[in-house]
């Protein structure tokens, strides 16, 4: 039971780091502005990206939004077949699901209908009213351990109270390839 709880806590921390990590003593998240020349604060890390307002998912609006991911900061073209949209559960149910769900002629609902193939992932780490459109294969996260971390325990610390102390460790770091990944 303890090991499962520690692993879940580790997974939540990894999710937070990948989505919204500041880059200061933690990985750089997808929502951070890392373009060349941006100032890195020693107290708060990288600043958050400036949000782009999206009012609908019509091809004329969604296409240019996805096209921003197709060119790297150095001007090279990037090829991809699908993008990932990360949003929180409330925004998915209130905004994205109603805009991308349609009733089929067979009487069933087809969901997540986007003009460009898009996988929607829900994360509690994304702020309400925001979403992240990204290319997950362009985010590098290197681990020094297995993804489950390393669980250690000690009976020495609280020997007299007959209690065992557990801790979990994971060494890793990650960052997007460049500022155009998300």
Where are these regions (language model features)?
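Feature targets compositionally biased, intrinsically disordered low-complexity regions
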Residues: 22, 28, 36, 44, ...
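Extended alpha-helical or coil "stalk/linker/tether" regions that are enriched in polar/charged
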Residues: 46-87, 95-103, 108
